[in-house]
Amino acid sequence: MATTLKDVARQAGVSHTTCSAALRGLPNVSPRTRKKVLAAAQALHYNTNLSARMLRSNHSGLISFVVPDLSPTYYSMLSVELAREATSAGMQLVVQQSQHSASEESSIIGSALSSLADGFFVAPVAHYTDEDLSMLIGDKPAVILGDFTQTTQYDRVESPNSEGVNSAIQHLRQQGCTSIGIVGGMTDDKEADIPEGSSILTLQGLRMHAAMDALADLYHENRESIVNERLIDVGWNSDEGIRAANLFMESGMPYDGLFCLDDEIALGMLHGLHEAGVRVPEQVKIIGFNGIRHSAISTPTLSTVEVDLPGMASAVVSLLRRRIEHPDVETLPQKVTVGTILRARESTAAGNV
């Protein structure tokens, strides 16, 4: 009798759900538990059964999610939503991290494990052309996150950066802010393969440019002036947010409103300002972007532009499933833009600034 996932879970002494999450590389499983599950799978030859399944049906039922890093809560939350959607569709999600390395990303996509996948969802570090991706994944379907590669033949899913940024800036203005700054740098992808002279941008770059354009229109200034006068240039994590808070205070707190390009930056800023005795929102109002779970429980709670991650996951799985199940049906590449919701909370509450 073939070994089942339930058998592996029983051997490892974990629940069916935990076993499935561990085998798929999801972030909510401890390293110790993951090691125990993998050992049980190996002992029971569970991978062999996967190979047999492929021989029978020519499909593994696996979707590979290639992501820069699971440390940002945004990607962790997205992976959970993707796993839920994949399971509902009778598929399994495998998550692999490139650690922001273009070379590692290419290696992962072309690896033996990835060769088992029926399709790919890639949050890219490198800036691929159609030919690049085709060489790595062959004729398998792929969905690209964002609009910053040179691909034209693959489906893509993206969040509306310009619309989300504009809603955040408009919210700060409605709450009484007269001088608004941007917090966050262009990119954390230190090894990103950006062609010389290219106008192609990473997710960070797209959001950054949208913010610069919004403030340039608001203050009738050019981008260079915005960068020089209204940008606190830091990385996209909470430690850098704390550093941004210090830079903001050292510069004399020139803004009464701050738009952080990412919630993790904003949460770091809230902590740094609180430690220094700066009152939010009384002295400065802060809004983030993404809608990660911690934004609702910080002190003060963080206003944010929440991305529809369940909708994104649903779109990704639907696009992949259609192409996996109907490989001979030629359809034009689809682009799905998911929605956002502005969550107004305590960090931008109206009052004196």
Regions found by a protein language model. Give the residues of each.
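Short gly/ser/thr-rich secondary-structure transition/capping motifs
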Residues: 43-49, 103, 124-126, 242, ...
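Short beta-strand segments enriched in small/hydrophobic residues
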Residues: 18-21, 56-70, 179-197
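Bacterial carbohydrate/catabolite-sensing allosteric modules
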Residues: 43, 84-89, 137-144, 148-353
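Conserved acidic
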Residues: 25, 29, 51, 70, ...
